[in-house]
Amino acid sequence: MKFYLAPMEGITTPVYRNALYRHYGGADRYYTPFLANLSFNHKELREILPENNKGLSVIPQILTNRAETFLTIAKNLQAYGYKEANLNLGCPSATVTAKKRGAGFLSVPEQLDAFLEEIFTVCPLEISIKTRLGIASAHEWPTLLAIYKQYPLKELIVHPRYQKDFYNGRPHMEAFQMAADALSDSGIPLCYNGDIASPAQYQRLLVQNPSTEAVMI
């Protein structure tokens, strides 16, 4: 099992990541809070500078719905030695989704598909995706899965809630199993994210979905 540290704005800073690594053994991967600017400000530079992340496998996360923005940020990350970037399609915040970014981008699957086609054609980095199931309806998820399966994703990280769920209610575990079944012959690794805050919750996940190979907490 692989364990990933989820990106949390203002919490999973370089100081936090290094403290976790030094005192508790760390995680297999650490994801940064999202980057959204064409050029990095002081705070963003602090997140990604290699000297602030020595010994850590850090994956920068990008938030945008514009291919040219994603590609510019990816090229800037490449200059700092990064090999992979993660696309944020999971943030449920209204200030983000109102601009069709984060989970809000899931509301326009045709535009999302065109965006992915463009970035996968020319991006210098490998690309993973962190996603929700859609906005509010169960019919959205099969459509999104079919889109994701077309592309050579480094990994698909699924938080099995809808954008409208925010962080309320229980995750839709049947949707996560649907992803596992859909991707079983694709070669795309699958990671679970959501409501793993205790050993008991982790064990319950393994009972319900024994094929799970990675967990983001």
Regions found by a protein language model. Name each.
Residues 1-217:
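Flavin-dependent oxidoreductase catalytic cores
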